[in-house]
């Protein structure tokens, strides 16, 4: 009897197709079918035409593997727990996209939870994910304060915790790139929209800015800085706090915002104040989210490779789980300055003109 007319012997009463169903259908052993479908080492000794028969039968019979049962047998779930501060903002979305891409390519799954700045949820979610059998954790823009029970990689965690690998941007180098760019364009009075205090990147990024400003001889005026302290991840946040700085009527020729999404909002506030970008006020952001290139004008920004950071995090946690590589406490990521149309030479007559400053060579790497 041909396979196209053979009855499904060994089929379960619920109609679900199992390895035994396929084995009986092809007059093969379940072990042979399993080896082919799992592409195990044993399959290397199986003739090619037999492999093709198994794969064709699996497609024809609509076979769906039971990953949960497989994980119980092998004591593996191939599942990672991802704990993020936000998943709807461009930063978190791009990092998680990189995580997903690498995990998918390596036959891992992931469960994602979002704590929205509620520290009490971190422990709850950690325990919940462990109860569901995750083999490791990746945190995104979340401070890990205690040693984890499972392999853990933190993207922008900024905490030195034993057993946790931190993937961090070189914020001092990033600040050097941004401020040196503005300095060389003649900007001396620069306004700053500082990041929210609950964001794990905020303190390191601001410390880098202050250090580099001192190296350049730039004065950071208290009245030209404001800390954004609301739980918002839209351009409206940047618009609101840029309006606060503008209302102080202190002249400035450039504005450096904590991230791109708030920089885009700040551009709107500057324009609503009757000023032009970049002719009157240059604006620079941080991250290089996809929208930065399509803002009007195109946003100059410091790029941190968020997609690649997610991929590196996924690769690192898998390496730790499968003990492929030795533990490393920190992986440093280099930023890149992306110059677009939102920055230009400081030459606006309505603001206090700055005297020409002697050009100085400022190294891109911190001393």
Where are these regions (language model features)?
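Short acidic capping loops at alpha-helix termini that bridge into adjacent secondary structure
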Residues: 189, 220-224, 276-283
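Periplasmic-binding protein-like
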Residues: 126, 133-140, 191-194, 248-259, ...
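Short beta-strand segments enriched in small/hydrophobic residues
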Residues: 25, 30-35, 72-87, 181, ...
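Hinge/beta->alpha junction and helix N-cap segments in small-molecule ligand-binding domains
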Residues: 85-94, 113-121, 167-177, 193-243, ...
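N-terminal helix-turn-helix DNA-binding module of bacterial transcription factors
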Residues: 1-76, 364-367
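Alpha-helical recognition/docking segments in bacterial nutrient-uptake
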Residues: 1-14, 18, 75-180, 184, ...
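Flexible loop/turn connectors
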Residues: 241-367
């Amino acid at each position: 009897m041909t396979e196209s007319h053979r009855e499904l012997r060994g089929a379960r009463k619920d109609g679900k197709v199992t390895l035994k169903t396929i084995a009986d259908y092809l007059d093969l052993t379940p072990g042979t079918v399993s080896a082919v479908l799992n592409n195990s080492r044993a399959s290397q000794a199986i003739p090619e035409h037999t492999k093709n028969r198994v794969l064709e039968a699996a497609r024809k019979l609509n076979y769906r593997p039971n990953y949960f049962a497989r994980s119980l047998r092998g004591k593996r779930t191939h599942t990672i727990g991802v704990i993020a501060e936000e998943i709807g903002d461009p930063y978190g979305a791009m990092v998680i996209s990189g995580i997903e891409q690498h995990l998918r390519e390596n036959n891992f799954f992931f469960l994602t939870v979002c704590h929205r700045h509620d520290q009490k949820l971190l422990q709850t979610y950690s325990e919940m994910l462990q109860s569901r059998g995750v083999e490791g954790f990746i945190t995104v823009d979340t401070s890990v304060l205690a040693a984890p029970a499972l392999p853990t990689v933190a993207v922008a965690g900024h905490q030195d915790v034993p057993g946790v690998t931190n993937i961090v941007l070189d914020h001092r180098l990033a600040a050097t790139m941004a401020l040196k760019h503005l300095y060389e364009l003649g900007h001396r009075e620069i306004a700053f929209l500082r990041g929210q205090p609950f964001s794990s990147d905020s303190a390191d990024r601001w410390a880098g800015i202050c250090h580099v400003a001192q190296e350049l001889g730039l004065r950071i005026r208290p009245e030209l800085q404001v800390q954004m302290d609301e739980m918002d991840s839209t351009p409206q946040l940047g618009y609101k706090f840029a309006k606060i700085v503008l209302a102080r009527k202190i002249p400035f020729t450039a504005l450096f915002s904590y991230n791109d999404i708030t920089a885009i909002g700040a551009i709107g506030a500057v324009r609503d104040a009757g000023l032009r970008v970049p002719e009157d006020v240059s604006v620079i952001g941080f991250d290089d989210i996809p929208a930065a290139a399509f803002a009007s004008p195109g946003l100059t920004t410091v790029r941190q490779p968020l997609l690649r950071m997610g991929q590196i995090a996924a690769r690192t946690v898998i390496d730790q789980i499968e003990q492929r590589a030795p533990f490393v406490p920190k992986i440093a990521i280099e930023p890149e300055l992306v110059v677009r149309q939102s920055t230009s030479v400081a030459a606006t007559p309505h603001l206090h003109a700055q005297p020409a400053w002697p050009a100085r060579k400022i190294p891109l790497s911190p001393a």
